[in-house]
């Protein structure tokens, strides 16, 4: 996250020793970095080699010590797009990602959508009415909420909720916390 304190970023970079950092501050101690707003001078049409990273993701966790920890997914960086099928994520899906990509679920579902040839509409910060507006404006089909987000949307005045057409949604997925039965019933 761009909001991490510099000390935490330094600790994460020290633990991971990344080959490349995309974005970030110019003074970060990274062997190679691509600065924000980078535009290459030229792009080749030549096919690229297909290197596979050793790990497909490395998520951070504060843990109980106060020092950042890295949770490595030891699977290789290849994805079978068929894994998205049980999530009802069809090829070409239009997904709303209301959560930060440094959390596991938003990271995974956004990647599955992109790997399936879909598009991702992200939110810089969750806002209940803005989520409804984006679903309406972009005819989004799939979203992963946490119960708190669903509660905030349901807590909007009925006239605000009804202002937006969300009939394009095919899947509303939730995880990360228990869902109160009454809230799930309202959403169904």
Summary of predicted features, one role per range:
Residues 9, 27-33, 70, 106-108, ...:
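Short glycine-/acidic-enriched loop or helix-start segments at secondary-structure transitions
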Residues 3-4, 24-26, 53, 126-127, ...:
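Short beta->alpha linker loops
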Residues 1, 99-103:
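Conserved AMP-binding
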Residues 1-51:
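Structural core segment of the AMP-binding/adenylate-forming
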Residues 80-94, 102-142, 156:
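Conserved AMP-binding/adenylation subdomain of ANL enzymes
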């Amino acid at each position: 996250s761009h909001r991490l304190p510099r000390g935490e970023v330094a600790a994460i970079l020290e633990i991971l020793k990344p080959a490349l950092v995309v974005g970030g501050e110019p003074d970060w101690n990274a062997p190679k970095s691509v600065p924000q707003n980078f535009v290459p001078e030229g792009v080749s049409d030549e096919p690229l080699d297909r290197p596979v990273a050793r790990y497909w993701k490395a998520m951070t966790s504060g843990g109980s010590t106060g020092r950042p920890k890295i949770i490595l997914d030891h699977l290789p960086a290849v994805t079978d797009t068929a894994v998205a099928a049980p999530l009802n994520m069809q090829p070409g899906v239009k997904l709303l990602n209301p959560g930060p990509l440094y959390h596991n679920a938003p990271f995974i579902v956004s990647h599955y959508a992109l790997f399936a040839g879909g598009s991702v509409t992200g939110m810089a910060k969750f806002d209940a009415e803005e989520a409804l507006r984006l679903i309406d404006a972009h005819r989004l089909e799939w979203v992963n909420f946490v119960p708190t987000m669903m509660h905030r949307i349901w807590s909007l005045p009925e006239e605000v909720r009804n202002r937006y057409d969300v009939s394009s949604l095919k899947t509303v997925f939730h995880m990360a916390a228990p869902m109160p039965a009454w809230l799930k019933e309202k959403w169904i």
